């Protein structure tokens, strides 16, 4: 919802498609009731946004220049099975974050000429404070993405740069997937916090509690292993 509202505020015609009735369904219902109106609160600045179109029909991805897939990565296979049949040559499917879900899309008989792109991480971090109200935590000033096939990069770049997001284009979607920091941060933080999570019955905030010096040491070692994998793949091991 936040990305849809943000791009709408930048002047893009946006269609927000909700593919389930689970997370943030109350916010989507609010948007439907108010004509797509949402406010973004960002460090003392309030921006009123109007999302042009709201839908629960995945067929509405047809004809869109860019299709952004923003659902949780665990649901990528299911959502892609529903979306891919409606994609046509020239469209760009941008998965945020990607986590190498390009592999799922390619296994679904994707139409020739559809361009796939994977973002390393979300462009905007924040929380929905109330229906129709989004509080920005931070914006990434550098947003790495990979494009598949690689020879489609010039055409994809021409379209994606119109969004106004500060993109950095990587060598491959694999590089974008491996560079996602959550692969390391969430794994170490969650595993090392299991006793604390159980003791508090889930009343726990990983970013505030998990990363003691010993846990951070483990994170650094595992991240170093990942960097060596990136080097062997011919990618840039950006820390």
What are these regions (language model features)?
Residues 41-63:
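Short acidic low-complexity segments
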Residues 150-158:
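Short, conserved charged micro-motifs
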Residues 11, 51-52, 64-65, 90:
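Short, well-ordered alpha-helix to beta-strand connector turns
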Residues 177-239:
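C-terminal substrate-binding/catalytic lobe of Rossmann-fold NAD(P)-dependent dehydrogenases
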Residues 1-40:
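NAD(P)+-binding Rossmann beta1-loop-alpha1 motif at the extreme N-terminus of oxidoreductases
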Residues 14-17, 114, 167:
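Hydrophobic anchor at the start of a short beta-strand
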Residues 131-151:
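Short beta-strand and adjoining strand-loop segment in the mid-core
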Residues 68-69, 73-134:
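Rossmann-like NAD(P)(H) cofactor-binding subdomain of soluble oxidoreductases
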